[in-house]
């Protein structure tokens, strides 16, 4: 899962990004509205954390431009002012949730998880595919009720496949969602991680669609 953080306070932005990375997300950051708008408009993200008080282009303008351009990723708005009028403006511009500063990082993480679940049409934080269960709140995985230990990349790949269960996901799309920009994006590594997951979760846990990509079963 890829998250964009647009926050001009470098210290706070680093804290948010660090907490998201520890939770298993791939994070990209922007310090001003123009950079944030560009990243959100040209790259695929599963959710955005967007501050309103940005230099260059304020958060409301950034959000409106995204929505005008057909960008539908869920957006969590951050602001230093807990004003009802500002909330209304943010929601009218296309925001999905709202969090006033200061806030507890655990609440921000919970709201991001909820946004991603809602955007995927799910209310349950536990993803299920056959005998496999993945709890998105803590990243734990079980097979027939028995805990399975996964590496960070294995967990990211599994969560992405399970979030999009029933859909065929190509290598390029998978790479964009589970690898940070500064890492080697060799598509052959996707095959390596798929093989590892099959060893741990069963040979039929992930289906290969010849010439297209991979798919996990729903429910």
Over which residues does each language-model region extend?
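N-terminal/domain-start alpha-helical segments
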Residues: 1-119
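Short strand-coil-strand connectors
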Residues: 8, 128-130, 137, 144-146
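Structural detector for helix-capping/boundary residues
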Residues: 43, 52, 106, 130-132, ...
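Short acidic-rich active-site patches of cyclic nucleotide enzymes
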Residues: 96, 212-213
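The C-terminal output helix
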Residues: 114-127, 166
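A short, compositionally biased
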Residues: 121-122, 134-140
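Positively charged, aromatic-enriched patches within helix-turn-helix-type DNA-binding elements
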Residues: 140-205, 210-212, 218
């Amino acid at each position: 899962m890829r998250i964009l953080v647009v926050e001009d306070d470098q210290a706070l932005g680093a804290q948010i990004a660090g907490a998201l990375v520890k939770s298993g997300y791939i994070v990209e950051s922007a310090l001003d509205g123009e950079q944030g708008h560009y990243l959100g408009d040209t790259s695929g993200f599963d959710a955005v954390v967007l501050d309103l008080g940005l230099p260059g282009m304020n958060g409301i303008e950034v959000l409106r431009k995204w929505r005008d351009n057909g960008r539908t990723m869920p957006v969590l708005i951050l602001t230093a002012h807990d004003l009802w009028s500002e909330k209304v403006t943010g929601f009218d511009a296309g925001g999905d949730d709202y969090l006033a500063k200061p806030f507890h990082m655990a609440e921000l993480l919970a709201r991001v998880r909820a946004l991603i679940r809602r955007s995927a049409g799910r209310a349950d934080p536990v993803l299920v595919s056959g005998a496999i269960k993945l709890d998105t709140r803590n990243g734990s995985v079980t097979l027939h009720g028995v805990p399975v230990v996964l590496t960070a990349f294995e967990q990211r790949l599994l969560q992405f496949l399970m979030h999009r269960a029933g859909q065929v996901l190509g290598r390029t799309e998978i790479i964009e969602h589970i690898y940070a920009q500064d890492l080697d994006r060799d598509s052959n590594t996707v095959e390596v991680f798929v093989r590892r997951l099959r060893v741990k979760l069963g040979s039929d846990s992930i289906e290969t669609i010849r010439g297209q990509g991979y798919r996990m079963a729903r429910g």
